[in-house]
Amino acid sequence: MKVECASNIGFCFGVRRAINILEKTAAEKGGVETLGALVHNQQVLNRLSGMGVRVVKNIEDISGRTVAISSHGVGPLVLDELKSKGLEVVDTTCPFVKRAQVAAKRFHDAGFFTVIYGDVNHPEVKGIMGWAGGDGLATLNPQGLVDVPDVSRYIGVLSQTTQIPTGFTSFVKNVIDQALVKDAEIRIADTLCHDIRERQTAALELAGRVDLMLVIGGHNSANTRHLLDLCKTVSNTYLIETASELQTGWLRGVNRIGITSGASTDETTISEVCSYLGSLSAGT
């Protein structure tokens, strides 16, 4: 049984940057709180917890004088509230997410109705919507504009950074089809993360060459779920968070296994999965 890892695997640039910032802050201050989980990966959060990093869900729960913003970012009103309380804010927002926030603000300042292709309940999308002044729509439904009464003829479209490119392209086409009858002016900002795009491409290429694909990452991670959906289109694919979730029944008749990971999956977890697969192969 041969195991091959995709070329883009492990932490993405944004996650690695956020973790480095948080580790440094925790070491300097003897611990730090984060407003929301830094990333959607429990193994990483457990390790950070051991370094004195504590996750709080609400601003009211902050007990210290320093708080870190997660890599998913927040809206301007949240930032203003934190600063009004005299808190030191450590911003670990991913630069690609920042770019999406800037695009949303630019649309808003120009008087455009902002349409975000993304999960309305995801913290990244909530933050981006905040930079659009709350005047917009976040949806994955290509017919979403139909349900918006009196939508502006000026429309700005952008995407949650971790979405699948073909999905965003299809979404944009549908927005144009719906809006043209309103004599609309449409602006489109490509806010997809380049790292995630390359990761998806590499995973899809590998999935086409193996009998089984394993996606390692958090079950609640958006970019990890997108990798699962993509790989499923060409290969038998399973999502696991740790080696303990791997079922030996999946491996019957399998000669080649491909591995990819979500952007917040650490190298230790990936190595443990590879080692476990190696032990199974040696025992056959």
Swiss-Prot record:
Coiled-coil annotation reads none
| Residues that, per the record, bind isopentenyl diphosphate | H40, H72, H122, S221, N223, S264
Q: What's the cofactor?
A: [4Fe-4S] cluster
The molecular function terms of the Gene Ontology recorded here are: 4 iron, 4 sulfur cluster binding; 4-hydroxy-3-methylbut-2-enyl diphosphate reductase activity; metal ion binding
Pathway-wise, it operates in: Isoprenoid biosynthesis; dimethylallyl diphosphate biosynthesis; dimethylallyl diphosphate from (2E)-4-hydroxy-3-methylbutenyl diphosphate: step 1/1; Isoprenoid biosynthesis; isopentenyl diphosphate biosynthesis via DXP pathway; isopentenyl diphosphate from 1-deoxy-D-xylulose 5-phosphate: step 6/6
**Could you confirm whether the keyword Repeat appears in this record?**
no
According to its UniProt record, the EC number is: 1.17.7.4
Top EC class of this enzyme = oxidoreductase
Q: Which family does it belong to?
A: Belongs to the IspH family.
Q: What is this protein called?
A: 4-hydroxy-3-methylbut-2-enyl diphosphate reductase
Specify the species: Dehalococcoides mccartyi (strain ATCC BAA-2266 / KCTC 15142 / 195) (Dehalococcoides ethenogenes (strain 195))
